[in-house]
Amino acid sequence: MSRPQARPIPALRWWIGGVLFASTAINYIDRQTLSILAPYLKQDYHWTNADYADIAIAFRVAYSLGQTVWGRLIDRVGTRRGLTIGVTWYSIVSVLTSLANGFTSFAAFRFLLGAGESANWPGASKAVSEWFPKREREIGRAHV
C-alpha cells in the first residue's frame, strides 16, 4: 500500500525565511534589552559601570566562541535539529535569567544566553543555503 503524497507548501522557503527572520529579530531585540535596562539594573543591583561592562562582555565572549561550536554542531546534527536546540536553549536561559540575584548569577545567565543565541547566525545561514535557490539566496540572507 502506498502512502499518500504530501502536498507541497507553496513558497515554503519564504515561510522558513520568515521564521528565521523572527528568530534573528528576537536575538537582536534581546541583545538590546540589557542596554535599555542598564540604569535600572545598575541601581537595583548596585553595579558599577565596570560590573555592567563585565556582564555585557560575558555575553559577547560566549556569542563569539559559540558560533564556531554551533556551526560544527549544526553541520553534524542538521539545521532543523541544531536550530531547535539553540532556540530552546536561549528561550530557557531567558526565563532563567529572571532568577538572577546578583552580579555572578546575572553574568552567568548572560554568558549562557550568548552561547545559545550564537546558534542563530550559522544555523540561519545554512538554512538559507539549503532552502533557497542560488538566484534567491542573497535576498533570503538579507531577510535573516
Which residues are covered by each model-predicted region?
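Helix-breaking motifs and short loop linkers at transmembrane-helix boundaries and internal kinks
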Residues: 46, 78, 99-105, 116, ...
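Extracytoplasmic
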Residues: 15-49
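Conserved MFS/SLC helix-loop-helix module at the cytosolic interface between two early adjacent transmembrane helices
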Residues: 65-104
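Helical-face signature of the major facilitator-like transporter fold
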Residues: 20-28, 60, 94, 102-106, ...
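Cytoplasmic helix-loop-helix junction between adjacent transmembrane helices
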Residues: 109-141
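Juxtamembrane helix-start elements in MFS-like secondary transporters
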Residues: 48-56
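Small-residue-rich segments within alpha-helical transmembrane domains of MFS-like 12-TM solute carriers
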Residues: 28, 32, 98, 114-122
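Residue-level signature of mid-helix packing/kink "hotspots" within the transmembrane helices
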Residues: 32, 60-68, 118
